[in-house]
């Protein structure tokens, strides 16, 4: 079946029904026109993933492999996978990044709790495109275990790296600091051409997007600090 994902036509060659149901909202109305990406899974890829995922169904394992295939081809179209939670506010997207367990979903949910007009684009594995001198964040079916996201897109206007801390503080990061953290949040393809394209994409992100380090607790004060730094606006809680 053909799906519309991140502005591209993607043919997904799946064996199990899991992915068909998983991607239903992204099914293309046009199943006949040409495609940009053909995603498939070899027996070797499936077996390798299954060896690492013994407690999951074959359909789930195939689904993981298929998205890896899709994302490995994205650099051909000036796009990459970013491991982040991305939300939209006032027509602009903001990405929250960090190691597993640092609270990306928790912090972005606090944005939704305390700020009017916030919505999730993707809670875990969005696709980014660089187009017309700006970055576009796309929702995808792969949204993480919480299932937070929509089939939508918005210009990405800032990055916020999270660290747990006993007190809340935020600072603007240097290019070197951003590079060290950002590199761990992407999928680096195996093909040399795609590796080069991905690294060029990351260079643009580092140079063109403001990046912040938020050391935070689970609190409204943490939301205020990240909101004001990323948006440049005064924080007003919707609960007042």
How does the language model describe each region?
Residues 107:
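Hydrophobic positions on the alpha1 helix immediately C-terminal to the Walker A/P-loop
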């Amino acid at each position: 079946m053909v799906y519309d994902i991140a502005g591209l036509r993607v043919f997904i060659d799946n064996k199990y029904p899991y992915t068909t149901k998983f991607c239903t909202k992204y099914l293309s109305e046009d199943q006949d026109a040409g495609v940009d990406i053909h995603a498939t899974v070899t027996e070797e890829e499936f077996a390798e993933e299954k060896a690492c995922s013994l407690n999951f169904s074959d359909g789930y394992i195939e689904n993981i492999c298929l998205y890896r295939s899709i994302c490995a081809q994205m650099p051909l179209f000036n796009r990459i996978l970013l491991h982040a939670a991305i939300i939209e506010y006032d027509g602009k997207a903001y990405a929250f990044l960090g190691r597993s367990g640092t609270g990306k979903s928790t912090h972005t949910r606090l944005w939704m709790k305390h700020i009017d007009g916030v919505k999730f684009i993707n809670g875990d594995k969005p696709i980014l495109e660089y187009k017309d001198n700006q970055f576009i964040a796309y929702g995808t079916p792969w949204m993480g275990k919480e299932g937070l996201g929509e089939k939508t897109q918005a210009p990405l206007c800032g990055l916020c790296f999270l660290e747990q801390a006993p007190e809340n503080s935020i600072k603007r990061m240097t290019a070197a600091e951003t590079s060290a953290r950002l590199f761990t949040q992407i999928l680096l393809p195996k093909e040399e051409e795609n590796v080069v394209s991905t690294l060029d994409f990351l260079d643009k992100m580092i140079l063109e997007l403001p990046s912040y380090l938020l050391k935070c607790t689970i609190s409204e004060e943490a939301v205020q600090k990240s909101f004001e730094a990323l948006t440049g606006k005064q924080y007003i809680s919707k609960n007042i």
